[in-house]
Amino acid sequence: MRRIITGHNQEGKSVITIDGPPARSIGEDVGGLFEIWNTNGSPIDTRDSHDRADSEIILSPSPNGTKFRYFQINPTPEGVPWEILQDAAAEAFERIGAAHHRIDTSKHPAMHKTETIDYIILLQGDVSLLLDEEEVRLQPFDTVVQRGTNHAWVCLLYTSDAADE
């Protein structure tokens, strides 16, 4: 994945300040979470070349901040016991400072609730969005505005050529 961040030079001309891979990633063995850009609610300084995504990966943004990230989930292998899935999800959420967001995991081990608005575009694969009372199956290029609800993402089928369809 290539990430291009723009800004301004000392003369006020637009330039590329970062051209390369995401600054940080985590969980690549099960798909991965890749940090693209973060804001913390402070005024924007477009002459600053600091990589705002090069910090510890935490699920939720700081107050008045934002997070722009790419994530991928792989299908859950069949036959994995519920307890193993619960333990793996608990460890994964702990690693990104989000254990406290797992308020009700009775429907799925990855269920979590944040006080954020999340914008999701499914690029490839076959994914279900699980909610407390409903489930919706997503196809490539479906979009979701997730508004602070208890939810989980479940990959039903991953295909590397789904984006080409």
Q: What residue ranges belong to the model's regions?
A:
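Conserved short histidine dyad/triad with adjacent acidic residue
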Residues: R69-T114, G148
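Conserved small/polar residues in nucleotide/adenosyl-binding loops
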Residues: Y158-E165
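Short histidine-centered beta-strand/loop micro-motifs
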Residues: I26-E28, I58-S62, V80-L85, H108-T114, ...
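Conserved metal-binding segment of the jelly-roll/cupin
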Residues: L131, L138-H151
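Structural motif
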Residues: K13, D126, N150-A152
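N-terminal leader/capping segments at the start of a protein or of a new domain
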Residues: M1-E56
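A short beta-strand-loop-beta hairpin characteristic of the jelly-roll/cupin
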Residues: H108, H112-Q139
